[in-house]
Amino acid sequence: MNSLFVLIKRELIVQNRINNIIKYLVIFFLFCIISTVLINSERDINKFGLIFSVICLLISLIGFSSVIFKSDLEDGSLELLLSIVSHEKIILAKFFAIFISSTIGLVFVLPIIYVLFDKTLLEIIFFFSSVWMILVLSSSLVVLSGSVQCYFKKNANFVGTFIMPLLIPNIIMTGLILQDNNLQLIFIMIGINLVFLPISFFLSSCLIKNIYNIT
């Protein structure tokens, strides 16, 4: 367990010093939010503004799938880690680093959303809960996409484009939650996550385990 915490700490440092994931997500999310407010009417903002911003956030997060293993693969640290800790812990560390960074980025922009979109505190809580569920699934899929690209090394950049369709059900649920403040839909999102998360972790672990043919 201690080794997992050490790996998560290392990944948080790597992803935010090298890839600047928190800074990038906050800036991109703010840009999408402010652009939405400036170019749309108040009615359209209330209907579609937040959903559009969430979609943009997920697109920006998917972009990290090609780099999450890049530095580890280039400097040989991935091979070293595989000889020291289990491949499952490496995948979990990647997942938690991306998920924690994404959550921090989301928390930073919540006050801006509260002001610009004129939402109540309850609506902000529903919004955070639903997007948080999406971030759980998207973080695992980003790791899976990164694992595929790391394993094949070439001509695998297209893999990231397959992530977005898997997130569509949760995006639809988020829209319904924001429209009706229906807490029960969050439990459906949890169920969707419970279906995809084990599959994503299993496939990612298998790919990383066999990348150097290490057993």
UniProtKB/Swiss-Prot annotation:
Q: Give me the segments passing through the membrane.
A: 21-40, 50-69, 95-117, 122-144, 156-178, 183-205
Which region is the signal sequence? none
> Per the annotation, which location comes first and is thus the protein's main one?
membrane
The record's section on InterPro entries has: Cyt_c_biogenesis_CcmB
- Tell where it localizes: Cell membrane
Annotated keywords: Cell membrane, Membrane, Transmembrane, Transmembrane helix
Example GO CC term: the record gives: plasma membrane
Q: Does the keyword Transmembrane apply?
A: yes
Molecular function terms from GO: heme transmembrane transporter activity
Give the membrane topology, semicolon-separated if more than one: Multi-pass membrane protein
Coiled coil spans: none
Q: Which domain of life is it from?
A: Bacteria
**Gene Ontology biological-process annotations:** cytochrome complex assembly
Q: Which family does it belong to?
A: Belongs to the CcmB/CycW/HelB family.
The name under which this protein is listed is: Uncharacterized protein RC0356
Taxonomic source organism: Rickettsia conorii (strain ATCC VR-613 / Malish 7)
